[in-house]
Amino acid sequence: MKKIIRIIALIMAMTFVLCSCSNLTFTSSTDSETTSPAVNTEGDGLFGNNKTEENAVNSSDTEHPKVKFTMENGGSFVIELYPEYAPQTVENFVDLVSDGFYNGLTFHRVVEDFMAQGGDPEGTGMGGSSKRIKGEFAINGFEQNVLSHTRGVVSMARSSSYNSASSQFFIMYSDNHTYLDGQYAAFGIVISGMEVVDSFLETERTMGNDGALSKPVEPIVIEKAEVL
C-alpha cells in the first residue's frame, strides 16, 4: 500500500513545475548532450553513486567554485559549480551564499525519485530573493547546457517566465527526468554528501502546494551555506 501511495504521489508531483509558483506545468524535451568521463558523487545514498555519462563535465581551465551546505542535523554536502555552462546562475548563487541568504532556510519540497527543492525564504515555494536572473537554457536562446538533469545535478527553479529564477534551486534524485534539459538552468553537481540529500526522503511528508505528498512535516533546515 505504501508503495502504491508513493507512486501516486510521484505522478502527481511530476505534473507540476519545479518553480516558485505551483500552477504551472512542464513542457517535455528529450534533447540532451553527453560527454565523458562520468562524474562521481561520493556516497551511495538511496539510489547509488552519481555515476552517469549524462552529467559528465568537460575538463577545462575554468575555476569551479564549491559550496558547502551544512544541515541543522549536522550532515553536510558539497556542490561544485560550473560557470562555463551557466555563468549568471553561478554568480547569483555564489553571491547569495556569500551573503548568508540560505542560512536558516529549508528544503520545502522533497519528492522521491525526482528532486529536493529549497532556497525559498517563505518556505512555501512561492518566494525568492529580490534579484531575478536570466534563464540560461536552450528554450530561452542559450546554448544547450551539457549538464543533464540526472542524479546529483543542481538546477534553478523558476515560474513560467523564463527569466524568473532567483534563489530557489533543486537537486535531482534520479536519472529519469532528462526532459528538463533545455528548460531549466543546471549549474552544479553534488560531489560529496549525496547521502545527506537522500536522507531528506526519510522525513515524513504531507500535502504540499504542488498537490503531492512533498512537504516535510519536520522542517529540513539549512544551518549554514558557505563558499569553500
Give the residues covered by each predicted segment.
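Cyclophilin-like peptidyl-prolyl cis-trans isomerases
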Residues: F16-L228
